[in-house]
Structure formats: structure tokens, C-alpha cells
Amino acid sequence: MDTQFINIGFGNIVSANRVVTIVSPESAPIKRIINDGRERGQLIDATYGRRTRAVIITDSNHVILSSIQPETVANRFLFNKDD
């Protein structure tokens, strides 16, 4: 299996093979997932102090915060899958 990566902003990359979902952080359940990830020590903040616009959840239950739109991350994900 070929390892592919997704740029999630500011030079940060995530393994495309490990991504389970890419969601917006606006809803209460996603905010709970973010807080749970923080408590478990599995939260990765890749926003560089900017507003969180996308939450990426991996198969290892890591929660990754990104400051780019979920649609942009998803488009990069789909573009990488086509290669």
C-alpha cells in the first residue's frame, strides 16, 4: 500500500491512509470529541493560533485541528487518491 499525505496547512501533513473523517468544529458533539482528545492527550493542534475550521479524526483516535476549511482538506484528500 502506497503512503500518501494531505497538507493540512502551514506545512503540516497527515497520512491520508489514517484519516477516518474530516468535519467542521461547530457542533456540540464535535466540541466534545475535541475536549475528550485533549483530556486523553491525543489532540494535535495544527492551527498555529488561528481559528479551527476543520477537525480531522484518525483511525488511532487522534484528533487533529486545522485552520483550513473541511472542504479544502477533503478536496486535497480526493486529489491525492486520484494519483
From Swiss-Prot:
Disulfide pairings: none
InterPro entries xref list: RemA-like (IPR007169)
Family matches, as HAMAP family: RemA
One of the Pfam families matching this protein, by short name: RemA-like
Species per Swiss-Prot/TrEMBL record: Trichodesmium erythraeum (strain IMS101)
Domain of life according to the entry: Bacteria
PANTHER family (UniProt xref): REGULATORY PROTEIN SSL2874-RELATED, REGULATORY PROTEIN TM_1690-RELATED
Family in the record: Belongs to the RemA family.
Name of the protein this chain belongs to: Putative regulatory protein Tery_2835
